[in-house]
Swiss-Prot record:
Protein name: Serpentine receptor class gamma-30
One GO location term (cellular component): membrane
Family classification: Belongs to the nematode receptor-like protein srg family.
Primary localisation category: membrane
High-level lineage: Eukaryota, Metazoa, Ecdysozoa, Nematoda, Chromadorea
Originating organism: Caenorhabditis elegans
Topology of this chain in the membrane: Multi-pass membrane protein
């Protein structure tokens, strides 16, 4: 039977979890505030395809954060649970594979952001009428982003998985019973596609942001600035993910260190986007932090 790593200080591991708990709760507060405003004034904000996609992205972030708070990070950072769980699940089980829902949601979130930056690039280089076309295809884009990641995770869901020690706790690992691309390999593919798309579209947006074709130029420029700011964090987090998946760590401790650092990098793109949106979009910020019932545009 697998054994938990000895030597991890319970108080220190609980402190690590506590720090993550705090910034996740803060992030949830911002997400719920923005989602509430977007939903309440949907007739106004739904005119912007970017905000439709951001609405979905924010919901995905909430789901991932809740999953991390309740299960994933609890398993990772609370040593007393390690031995008990390894005793309860001494053998691989398909029940454990349910935890791969986190990776699936991360893949969906990355693809959604790809289309968010594509929207911004289209906005600065295409004619005004293209916005109507974008609004029509957004539902199809969302369906595509939801279904596409299943190509990389269906094997994990259908295969048995097991718990393996990780720092003071443990993580889940699939036994991979099918001859297909692994979750790690698919993660590298999705991350690479996202990084390339984000970099290309961000360069286009930066070069052409002053030539935005829209009636509400200030609104469109603020949304583009928000996408550019988020892009920095996405490129950083996904680059870390690729390095962690492809690099060969010299020791188990280094492997665990890079996995923990990669998880923290992804935490940034879970928590920061609503803060960025509120900082760079005046009308959205006003609607969130004050009583404002007028149907105005999200500057």
């Amino acid at each position: 039977m697998l054994k938990c790593h000895p030597g991890f200080n319970t108080k220190l591991e609980l402190l690590k979890y506590g720090i993550q708990f705090v910034y996740f709760i803060v992030g949830l507060g911002f997400h719920f505030a923005v989602i509430k405003v977007l939903h309440k004034k949907w007739s106004v904000y739904s005119k912007y395809p970017f905000l439709k996609l951001y609405y979905v992205d924010s919901i995905l972030s909430v789901l991932i954060i809740l999953l991390d708070l309740v299960l994933i990070r609890v398993f990772n950072y609370i040593p007393p649970l390690c031995q008990w769980v390894l005793q309860e699940f001494p053998e691989p089980s398909q029940l454990i594979s349910i935890l791969f829902i986190e990776q699936y949601l991360q893949f969906v979130k990355s693809l959604i952001f790809c289309f968010m930056v594509v929207n911004r690039a289209n906005n600065v280089i295409c004619v005004k009428s293209f916005g109507t076309i974008q609004s029509c295809i957004i539902p199809h884009v969302i369906v595509f982003c939801i279904l596409c990641p299943l190509l990389g995770v269906w094997t994990a869901f259908l295969s048995d998985s097991r718990f393996v020690p990780f720092q003071g706790g443990f993580i889940h690992e699939t036994m991979m019973e099918y001859h297909w691309i692994t979750v790690s390999q698919f993660s590298v593919i999705i991350s690479s596609i996202t990084i390339v798309t984000v970099c290309i579209c961000s360069v286009i947006s930066m070069l052409c942001i002053s030539r935005t074709h829209a009636e509400n130029k200030h609104t469109e420029q603020s949304l583009t600035a928000s996408a550019l700011a988020m892009s920095i964090f996405y490129v950083f987090a996904l680059s870390m993910n690729i390095y962690c998946q492809k690099a060969h760590a010299s020791s188990l401790e280094m492997l665990e260190f890079w996995k923990a650092l990669t998880a923290f990098a992804f935490d940034i793109i879970l928590v920061c986007p609503p803060v960025i949106m509120l900082c760079l979009n005046v009308r959205l910020r006003i609607n969130v932090f004050s009583v404002d019932t007028r149907p105005t545009s999200p500057k």
